């Protein structure tokens, strides 16, 4: 090595001299010489270190691994490297040979309990030994032998199936990995491994579906019947309509039974439908930090069957089923069978039966299922796709996903009620005129009655509203509750917030008036219409913003109310006490209603079936807003009584009144609106209270309010509508009730621009409207149905007697 360094030095010196001789710079030559010197020094130091390591290795091996001759003196104790001739010592040293009874840490193959470095041949290569010795010298630690003498565990004979979102994972997971989680730096669970020990055949199967036109309903019934035929099933399957569920959380955060298994049959619509709200709920639950991670891991499993039209809508083929499958998986559900996609045009019933048969065979597999969820899988797949080729993907694969490749509920804005939708057809059939894409107007039966002189609405008795000049309208056909007494029959959309296209308020009002007047014109040829009332009906004076849906959901509700006032139309706004922020910002209205349909949290959920989880807190906040921010408004609590649901606890109702302090409390018995099978409502005629029962409830309610020192009393009634009015005694001026409204004075005050309250536009309540007088408006003739039927029967009998028999033919 020294010879090479000398030769190198001579070469470098010669080159440097030649460089300087031909005019080179001295500084550069100096740098070259210094650099070469440093290089030689480093090379010399490295070789010296290597030699020291080898010497150290030899020194360490001598006492621990000496040969047979040196080990002759270790007969009794068996030295460090005692050999087989001398018995190796009874204790068997740390490097005892195969004769040792207890092989040490480096024993050979003869040791009964081989040590941590046992081997059939030599201990190892010199290089590995040198590295270990160096570590031992620099970092001296105590050697841990606890893992050395542990008995090896037996392997499982069978391994559960693993369903993973990451297809590249083929590892077999043992029984001990029943639950594992990976927690990210933000404290949230990024991945999890869950196991179901329930056998599929012993589970309780729920076939869940959503349907607008009946195809999905028939398909779900077919799946249900097919699964019901399985003799091996322990429990009979159950068939449920998603649209009839009062609370999705009972099934998709909690589970109805411990061994629940879901089979979802879902169509895909290009229009707004109840399925949109279901998907929105799943997405919110998956992204809600207040909801436990993976709540649906309590399920035995789930699978989804999607129905669609791959010919007409290839880009949206089964996209809602894909979304449901995605979000249920994100919530921790175990997919027991692949997502099914059936084209109803080309496949139809045959494909549904084929998918169901394969599902039935899968249910017979009793092996436990492990499902692996990894939140990073989506992002990793997206990165791989982004780094791949620029070829266009299949439209079926990208349908229903956002720009980032993940499912999103806000990727497309739909119309609330499209003209080609079943919802539009159902509403039209029920007598509504749909305005734009989300508003509606309908002529009230009391409007027809007053035009014919057969009576007026209860608002005439209680507040002086002329029914023949009142327009019932809603700027939002969607609602945030699914009340059991609602007459919408499940046809209207539901949502917690606005997610549709928005029509301008000017457009809604203009077309609402046109629609209302067109329906009034249809009354022109009806017998008994009073000409004077018919003429005035074409000048709308009042607008009841109720009808169906939730008007306060409309984003431009304040502008719409102001447009009504500009046309001299009063505003009667009804809300369901579920939107406190919108209620806080509402402008001046003629009268503000808040529906209080139950006095307790449990009963309110049972009656209103609200969509919000914090529905009770929202209602309480709305009551506080009425007492504070909106205390200048003329406020009314509206109670709809349903026997067997909310007529029990008057004390709890009094608590709510004490919290909100409304000016009036309007109590009305529920009206039965036909069959309730369409929207899952449990109401029958047995739940409709008689007028006497309503009076009894109102008297008990008033007594409880007075007992608490709240100044309320029974003021007016409309017995025909099963309706009574409790009013604050401040409206009883000089011993006379003033519950009616002076509408002309209201507009004078409104146009003046000055602040005013509800006490500034009062009008005396007429005698016929007071409690005890029935509330039937004069100038009308009440027609009793029983008498009408009796009279019609008598007229028919008279006609039969007077009509001569036809002549006998020749």
Swiss-Prot record:
Keyword Signal annotated:
no
Annotated Radical SAM core domain residues: 463-713
Cofactor annotation comment: Binds 1 [4Fe-4S] cluster. The cluster is coordinated with 3 cysteines and an exchangeable S-adenosyl-L-methionine.
- Please tell me which top-level EC class this enzyme sits in: lyase
User: Which key words tag this protein in UniProt?
Assistant: 4Fe-4S, Endoplasmic reticulum, Iron, Iron-sulfur, Isopeptide bond, Lyase, Metal-binding, Nucleotide-binding, S-adenosyl-L-methionine, tRNA processing, Ubl conjugation
Q: At which positions is FMN bound?
A: 211-215, 304-337
EC annotation from Swiss-Prot or TrEMBL: 4.1.3.44
- Where, in this chain's numbering, is [4Fe-4S] cluster bound? 479, 483, 486
Task: Indicate the segments forming the Flavodoxin-like domain, all copies.
Answer: 205-360
Any idea where this protein resides?
Endoplasmic reticulum
Q: Where is this region: Disordered?
A: 86-116, 156-176, 374-407, 782-810
Record's protein name: S-adenosyl-L-methionine-dependent tRNA 4-demethylwyosine synthase
Origin organism of this chain? Saccharomyces cerevisiae (strain ATCC 204508 / S288c)
Taxonomy of origin reads: Eukaryota, Fungi, Dikarya, Ascomycota, Saccharomycotina
């Amino acid at each position: 090595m020294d010879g090479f360094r000398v030769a190198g030095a001579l070469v470098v010196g010669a080159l440097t001299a030649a460089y300087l001789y031909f005019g080179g710079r001295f500084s550069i030559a100096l740098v070259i010489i210094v650099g070469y010197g440093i290089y030689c020094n480093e090379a010399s130091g490295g070789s010296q270190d290597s030699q020291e390591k080898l010497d150290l290795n030899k020194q360490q091996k001598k006492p621990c691994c000496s040969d047979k001759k040196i080990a002759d003196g270790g007969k009794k104790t068996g030295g460090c490297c005692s050999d087989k001739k001398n018995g190796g010592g009874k204790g068997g040293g740390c490097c005892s040979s195969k004769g040792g009874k207890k092989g040490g840490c480096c024993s050979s193959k003869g040791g009964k309990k081989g040590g941590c470095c046992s081997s059939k041949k030599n201990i190892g290569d010199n290089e590995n030994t040198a590295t270990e010795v160096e570590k031992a010298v620099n970092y001296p630690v105590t050697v841990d032998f606890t893992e050395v003498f542990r008995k090896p565990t037996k392997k499982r004979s069978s391994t559960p199936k693993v369903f993973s979102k990451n297809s590249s994972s083929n590892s077999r997971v043992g029984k001990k990995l029943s639950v594992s989680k990976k927690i990210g730096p933000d404290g949230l669970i990024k991945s999890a491994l869950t196991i179901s020990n329930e056998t599929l055949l012993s589970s309780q199967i729920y076939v869940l579906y959503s349907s607008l036109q009946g195809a999905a309903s028939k398909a779900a019934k077919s799946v249900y019947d097919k699964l019901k035929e399985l003799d091996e099933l322990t429990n009979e399957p159950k068939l449920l309509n998603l649209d009839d569920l009062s609370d999705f959380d009972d099934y998709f955060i909690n589970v109805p039974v411990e061994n629940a298994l879901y089979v979802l049959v879902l169509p895909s619509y290009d229009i707004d439908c109840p399925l949109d709200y279901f998907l929105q709920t799943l997405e919110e639950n998956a992204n809600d930090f207040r909801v436990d991670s993976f709540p649906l891991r309590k399920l035995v499993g789930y699978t989804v069957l999607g129905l669609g039209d791959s010919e007409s809508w290839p880009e949206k083929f089964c996209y809602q089923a894909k979304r449901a499958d995605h979000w249920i998986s994100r919530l921790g559900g175990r997919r027991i069978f692949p997502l099914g996609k059936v084209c109803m045009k080309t496949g139809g019933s045959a494909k549904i039966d084929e998918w169901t048969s394969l599902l039935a065979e899968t249910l017979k597999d009793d092996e436990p299922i492990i499902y692996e969820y990894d939140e990073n899988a989506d992002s990793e797949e997206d990165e791989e796709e982004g780094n791949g080729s620029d070829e266009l993907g299949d439209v079926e694969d990208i349908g229903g996903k956002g720009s980032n490749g993940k499912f999103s509920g806000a990727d497309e804005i739909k119309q609330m009620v499209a003209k080609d939708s079943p919802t539009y057809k159902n509403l039209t059939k029920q007598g509504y005129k749909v305005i734009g894409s989300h508003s509606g107007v309908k002529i009230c039966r009391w409007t027809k009655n007053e035009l014919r002189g057969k009576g007026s609405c209860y608002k005439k008795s209680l507040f002086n509203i002329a029914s023949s000049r009142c327009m019932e309208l809603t700027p939002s056909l969607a609602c945030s509750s699914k009340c059991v007494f609602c007459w919408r029959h499940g046809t209207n959309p539901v949502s917690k917030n606005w997610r549709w296209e928005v029509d301008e308020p000017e457009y809604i009002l203009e077309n609402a008036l046109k629609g209302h007047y067109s329906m009034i014109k249809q009354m022109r040829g009806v017998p008994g219409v009073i000409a004077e009332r018919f003429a005035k009906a074409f000048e709308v004076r009042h607008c009841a913003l109720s009808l169906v849906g939730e008007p306060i959901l409309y984003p431009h509700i304040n502008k719409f109310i102001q447009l009504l006032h500009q046309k001299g139309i009063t505003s009667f706004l009804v809300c369901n006490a579920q939107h406190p922020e919108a209620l806080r910002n509402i402008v001046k209205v003629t009268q503000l209603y808040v529906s209080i349909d139950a006095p307790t949290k449990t009963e309110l959920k049972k009656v209103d079936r609200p969509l919000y989880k914090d529905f009770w807190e929202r209602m309480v906040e709305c009551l506080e807003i009425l007492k504070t921010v909106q205390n200048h408004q003329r406020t009314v609590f509206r109670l709809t009584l349903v026997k067997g649901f909310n007529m029990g606890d008057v004390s709890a109702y009094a608590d709510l009144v004490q919290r909100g302090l409304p000016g009036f409390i309007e109590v009305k018995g529920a009206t039965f609106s036909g069959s309730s099978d369409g929207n899952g409502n449990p109401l029958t005629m047995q739940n409709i209270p008689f007028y006497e029962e309503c009076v009894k409830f109102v008297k008990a309610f008033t007594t409880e309010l007075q007992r608490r020192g709240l100044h309320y009393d029974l003021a007016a009634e409309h017995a025909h509508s099963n309706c009574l009015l409790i009013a604050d005694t401040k409206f009883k001026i000089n011993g006379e009730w003033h519950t009616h409204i002076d509408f002309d004075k209201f507009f004078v005050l409104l146009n003046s621009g000055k602040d005013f309250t509800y006490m500034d536009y009062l009008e005396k309540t007429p005698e016929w409207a007071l409690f005890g007088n029935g509330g039937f408006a004069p100038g009308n003739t009440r027609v009793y149905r029983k008498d009408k039927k009796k009279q019609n029967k008598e007229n028919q009998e008279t006609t039969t007697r007077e009509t001569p028999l036809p002549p006998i033919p020749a």
